[in-house]
Amino acid sequence: MGILAGKNVLVTGVLTDSSIAFHIARVAQEEGATVVLTSFGRAMSITKRISARLPQEAPVLELDVTNDEHLAQLSTLVKEHVPHLDGVVHSIGFAPEAALGGNFLNTEWPDVATAVHVSAYSLKSLTMACKPLFTAPTGASVVGLDFDAQVAWPKYDWMGVAKAALESTSRYLARDLGKENIRFNLVAAGPIRTMAAKSIPGFDEFESVWNSKSPLEWDVNDPVPAAQAAVALMSPFFTKTTGEIIHVDGGLHAIGG
């Protein structure tokens, strides 16, 4: 039996089979979980096609985390497939073009607000939408995907600020929902060549930094180590870990300039 045997997991953010979210869903299934995916808008048809590449094709529910109606009906839709949730994966992030690329001082509030709403506040929104489904006596684990926000990265700009907000949001959720045995942890992955990464100006600069400085060899085309960490955090191996950031970045976060 796998480490997620008998567990039900909701995974957001699956868009291509190169994404970390896809590999979380794949590894979770291989470890025994039943997986439900979310997507929305024009991406729905893409996610449904990609779902067929999983070991077991997973249902895809529509969810825009900025849409209150979608959030309100999420638990009802999930119950059509599984009776409860043991794990939730937050793989959601977006910043308008004006909030990236070295334009930090000139970015206007509406663009900043969009980045923070979609990338950070949505962790709280998604959690509260799923909370009625966290009924297992063993509690539930919410895992988010992060990019280290301890430092200011070139051209990452307001997305870096949004990731810092995500990290803080995770800690406050861990504080407030720990008494209900709901855990919150983030996986801070190194750069991975995903569709989302392609939209970040200067992504190649991240790759060169990792190639030259990370103690462990880093492969920007391999999302599996980050996916395995996320799955482990939803397993019985981490029942007393919450409010934590697990770095899966080849160790670069620990190295000075």
Positions of the model-derived regions?
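Canonical Rossmann dinucleotide-binding motif of NAD(H)/NADP(H)-dependent dehydrogenases/reductases
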Residues: 2-37
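Hydrophobic structural elements of the Rossmann-like NAD(P)H-binding subdomain
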Residues: 11, 89, 143, 184-187, ...
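Catalytic loop of short-chain dehydrogenase/reductase
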Residues: 13-22, 93-131, 135-179, 191-194, ...
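A glycine/serine/threonine-rich, flexible loop-to-helix segment
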Residues: 50, 158, 179, 191-215, ...
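Rossmann-fold cofactor-recognition segment
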Residues: 51-69
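Conserved Rossmann-fold cofactor-binding substructure of NAD(P)-dependent oxidoreductases
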Residues: 66-81
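Short-chain dehydrogenase/reductase
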Residues: 75, 123, 127, 170-171, ...
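C-terminal helical subdomain
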Residues: 121, 179, 186, 205-241, ...
